[in-house]
Amino acid sequence: MPYRICLISLGCAKNQVNSEQMLYLLNQAGHEVVGEVDGCDVAIVNTCGFIDSAKSEAIDQILQLAEVKKAGGLKKILVTGCLSQRYEKDILESLPEVDGMLGTGSFGQICAAVEDVMHGGRPLYFGDKSGPIEEIGRVVTTGPGWAYQRIAEGCDNWCAFCAIPAIRGRYRSRTLDAIVQEAQELADLGVKELIVIAQDITRWGMDLYGKPSLALLLRELAKIDGIRWIRLHYLYPEIIDDELIDLIANEDKIVKYLDIPIQHIDNDILRRMNRHCTGDEIRALLQKLRARIPGLVLRTSLITGLPGEGEAEFEELCTWLREVRLERVGVFPFSPEEGTPAAVMTDRCEPDEAQRRADLILELQAGIMDDYNAACIGRDMTVLCEHRARSGMCSGRTYADSPEIDGTVYFTGAARPGDMVTVHITGCDDGDLAGEQIHE
């Protein structure tokens, strides 16, 4: 029978895609999916379990639902995703309010879990996290005009600080046909921007063709009518080759924005991280990318406070950032993840010091970003409109901005959400741009 269900999605974009798949299955089964927990038969929390802050957020959400359940406003709680995969026994023992769990290999069984839990069971579905990828439809929940497209699952990089391979399993590529078919379906829905994601998109095809084949996939995606922007997230530096660089430079649909997680520039820290490139190799790659791809915007993520990072290593990182002037940077203080090599390393940096260093990098980066935005003033830039207020003020993003992590363009004009329009940039403030739509 149909039930009233609320699905709460936490964590990263990859997790959001899993939530969209579960929404699709629940809708297909005839369940009523709503946005409020009160009065629901089942609340599903799709969790992240990667770093301490994400784990805390997930546990807090579960405890909030437990209070609603205790008050009679909710019947059952299901927990899915990375936290349940990683801490199955702990959740069972410490959170008796949880009525069932699904791991990262079992999203396709969500409807069975709902039926089970509503009939008095306590379902524990933990399929093979390294098994074949199950192709499931999606209910797109992102903003108008754009959607994530996940091209692979799992990870084979085994960075010393990261538990993702243990949580999500080995790297598995989706097939070319499955990805292209999904992209066409997204285009048919009005999606203009595909944001290509995986834990490591540069490795796509290794398990299918015996070599990294991202360029092959991107050529096929670029053929799809209606798709105007293809944005690339999480390219590992050691696999970016000349074929891929040439394609990015010459294919108009691939936006000149690359998210390359570098994490650090000091050789010893990179070695401790089990990264597979040196500081000099990173410098050479970024120099090559700048030379070959005009207008390139680079984003990276960094970690401060890894065991062994002293003042000298941190200062090398800051000096490099001042020199290379990356347009977009995310930084995280080191979080020791149990079961990872970095969690048992000696020569620890105190958490407060790791946070202080992260804050210093953000302060440094804010000035670099402000300089980039100031240089945009006077330019006419293509903007994907995402919101339009009753006042007529619109907001959206240029090619230089990825949703939720980068800046916004606020502009006057007649654009509707999902439209791609030309905006004359007239100002900037606190990481965002201002402008006026040019009516063509």
Give the positions of each predicted feature:
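Conserved SAM/AdoMet-binding glycine-rich loop
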Residues: I77-G81, R86, I91, D188-A312, ...
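Proteins enriched for Cys/Gly/acidic motifs involved in redox and nucleic-acid/cofactor modification
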Residues: M1-W204, E243, L258, D280-A291, ...
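Conserved, mostly hydrophobic/aromatic
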Residues: C159, I179, V196, L232, ...
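Terminal RNA-binding accessory module
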Residues: V344-E440
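Generic beta-strand/beta-sheet core signal
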Residues: I8, I197-Q199, H233-L235, P261-Q263, ...
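Short beta-alpha junctions and helix-cap segments that line functional grooves
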Residues: L244-I245, L317, Y410-F411
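A structural micro-motif
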Residues: Y3, H31, K75, D99, ...
